[in-house]
C-alpha cells in the first residue's frame, strides 16, 4: 500500500502523508497530476494533495484535475501551517535579496514580504523544493519560505518564523483514491455541477439543498474555458450517500443540471 505526494521531503504534503500513514511506504513526485496518475495506474493506493488554504484560497490546478481525473476524495485533513524564512548557515536577514517558495506560500506571507519590498520573489513548484534549492546554491542572498522541518532536513538556519499573515493559517489536504470508497460514517459530500445558462438557475439549484435540509459548507465557482463567462460549481455539503434526503437531492440534480460528478463522500481525519 504505497502513498504518493507532490514535492520533496519536508513539503507540507510530506508532513501530512507521514501523519496519516506513518508506517506506509511513500514516494514523492514533481506535480499534482503526477501524484494522481500514480494512483490511477496502480503504482500507489492513495495520493495526498492540498486543495485549499484559509488565507490564499483554493489551489485551482487541483480543482481542474478533480474534474478530469477519475479519482475520489476518501478523507480530508486540516494542517496548521506556520511558515519560516530559511537561509544558508550564517546568513542574516540583511543579506537576503531573493526569496523562493510556492505561489500559495508567497501569498500567505504577502504582508511580511511587503515589509521587505526590496526582495525579489520567485515561485517554485513546492516550498521544500525551494529550501533544497537554497541549500544547493549555497548563496547567502537567497532564502526560502518553507516549514521548520525543511530547515532541519536541508541544514538551513531559521531567519524568521511564523511569517504568514494569518496566525490561524490552515491548509486543507485531501486523500485521493481510484477506489470509490464510501463509509456510513462519512459526513461530507463533494460535488461538481454545471448548470443550464438560464436566469436564476444557481438560486434554484441551491434551494434544492436547503429544501431537503442539507447544510451547504462551500460553493466555489471555476470558469468553463470553452464557454464564455459560464461557470462550473464545486459544492461541499454535510451528508451521507445512504441518507434519503441526499439521494433525493442527487436524483433531482440529475434532471436539472447539465453535468454532475460526485467527488467523494468522506470524513475529516483529526
Labelled PLM ranges:
Residues 1-270:
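Domain-level signature for soluble enzymes in the chorismate/prephenate branch of the shikimate pathway
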Amino acid at each position: 500500500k504505497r502513498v504518493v505526494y507532490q514535492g520533496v521531503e519536508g513539503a507540507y504534503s510530506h508532513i501530512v502523508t507521514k501523519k496519516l500513514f506513518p508506517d506506509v511506504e511513500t514516494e514523492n513526485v514533481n506535480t499534482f497530476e503526477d501524484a494522481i496518475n500514480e494512483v490511477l495506474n496502480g503504482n500507489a493506493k492513495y495520493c495526498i494533495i492540498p486543495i485549499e488554504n484559509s488565507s490564499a484560497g483554493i489551489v485551482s490546478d487541483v480543482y481542474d484535475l478533480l474534474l478530469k481525473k477519475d479519482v475520489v476524495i476518501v478523507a480530508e485533513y486540516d494542517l496548521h501551517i506556520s511558515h519560516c524564512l530559511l537561509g544558508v548557515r550564517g546568513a542574516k536577514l540583511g543579506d537576503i535579496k531573493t526569496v523562493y517558495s510556492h505561489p500559495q506560500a508567497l501569498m500567505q506571507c504577502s504582508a511580511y514580504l511587503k515589509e521587505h519590498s526590496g526582495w525579489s520573489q520567485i515561485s517554485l513548484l513546492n516550498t521544500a523544493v525551494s529550501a533544497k534549492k537554497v541549500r544547493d546554491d549555497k548563496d547567502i542572498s537567497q532564502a526560502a519560505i518553507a516549514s521548520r522541518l525543511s530547515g532541519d532536513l536541508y541544514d538551513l538556519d531559521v531567519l524568521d518564523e511564523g511569517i504568514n499573515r494569518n496566525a490561524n493559517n490552515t491548509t486543507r489536504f485531501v486523500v485521493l483514491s481510484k477506489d470509490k470508497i464510501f463509509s456510513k460514517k462519512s459526513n461530507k459530500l463533494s460535488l461538481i455541477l454545471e448548470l443550464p445558462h438560464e436566469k436564476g438557475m444557481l438560486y434554484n439549484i441551491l434551494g434544492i439543498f436547503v429544501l431537503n435540509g442539507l447544510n451547504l459548507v462551500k460553493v466555489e465557482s471555476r470558469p468553463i474555458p470553452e464557454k464564455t463567462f459560464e461557470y462550473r460549481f464545486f459544492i461541499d455539503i454535510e451528508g451521507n450517500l445512504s441518507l434519503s434526503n441526499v439521494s433525493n437531492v442527487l436524483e433531482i440534480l440529475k434532471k436539472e443540471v447539465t453535468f454532475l460528478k460526485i467527488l467523494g463522500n468522506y470524513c475529516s481525519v483529526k
